[in-house]
Amino acid sequence: MSTVYYPSVILKKSPLPLKLTPARASGNFGTPITAALQRASFNITIITRTESSSTFPAGLPIIRTSYTLENLTTALAGQDAAICVVGPGGIGAQVLMIEAAEAAGVKRFIVDDFGWGPGFRNLPEFRAIHAHRRAGWELAKAKAQANPNFTFTGITSGNPIDWAMKRFPLMGFDIARCSAIIYDSGTEKFTATTLAGIGQSVVGVLQHPDETANRFVKVLSIITNQNELLEAFQRVTGRQWPVQRASAQTLIESGQQKFQAGMGGWVLELVVAQMYDEGEARCVMAPSWEASDSPLLGVKKESADEVVAKVLQL
């Protein structure tokens, strides 16, 4: 059985060795993760807050409950695995979810990462956000060390490239206008995973419990840069895209000023800036697809043209 927090989703009575619980099955990552689990023939039960207005895939059982240790422990009873995909707004609840999962006898807890992982050299403005995530990661690690029946996995997937490029023109590509912003030389490499790849990474972890126990796995669909993506957009759309030149350092300065002034918008600016900050290689999680955990977990290697086609279809 499995549970996903949909805050939550629980996968029950799976034909596979594990039963799972995913958290936040309706969100940006929860939706493709839940779809991948369904394709892999896991049975899913959703756990969500009583007051949640989220919509969920048709036909899935839903448990609506308040997020207390007692209630979550009851909801998780009998589950083999729990998958936390609560996102930044709910990350503070991950500690409670881990406590409940261990108390309920859950065998595997997939912690909320789906980003850059514990070793990421992020900008100082992200330290508070990272500390919230790390609190859950450290608790899961401690629980696993103390209880041999409880294990955890973190999935470091880098930039969610098709979703991010479609949603955020500041990342360099305005899909609606077919125009681009290229930061500096456009050659800074970064690793990224498509939504389909993120979903498959969860399935792969659950299908390879021994190889993925008590560690962060690193997955990717592509290693690329802005110039490669621009060429792909132009090939796939069959037209030249006008290009505006910009600087990652200017974006860093703008984001830091907004952060210090208590203004909104700084998170996106600094997320984009640290990805394109030339020569830093902050956002390369593995030197190649082959050197990552992608082959083990069944995450496909994709070309720039394939990724761009997915962006245009979203």
From Swiss-Prot:
Protein's name according to its UniProt entry: Oxidoreductase poxI
Family: Belongs to the NmrA-type oxidoreductase family. Isoflavone reductase subfamily.
EC number of this enzyme: 1.3.1.-
Coiled coil segments of this chain: none
Entry superkingdom: Eukaryota
Inducing stimuli: Expression is positively regulated by the oxaleimides biosynthesis cluster-specific transcription factor poxB.
GO molecular function: oxidoreductase activity
Enzyme class per UniProt: oxidoreductase
Role: Oxidoreductase; part of the gene cluster that mediates the biosynthesis of oxaleimides, cytotoxic compounds containing an unusual disubstituted succinimide moiety. The first step of the pathway is provided by the HR-PKS poxF that serves in a new mode of collaborative biosynthesis with the PKS-NRPS poxE, by providing the olefin containing amino acid substrate via the synthesis of an ACP-bound dec-4-enoate.
Cited Pfam families: NAD_binding_10 (PF13460)
Signal peptide: none
Pathway where this protein functions: Secondary metabolite biosynthesis
Alphabetized UniProt keyword annotations: NADP, Oxidoreductase
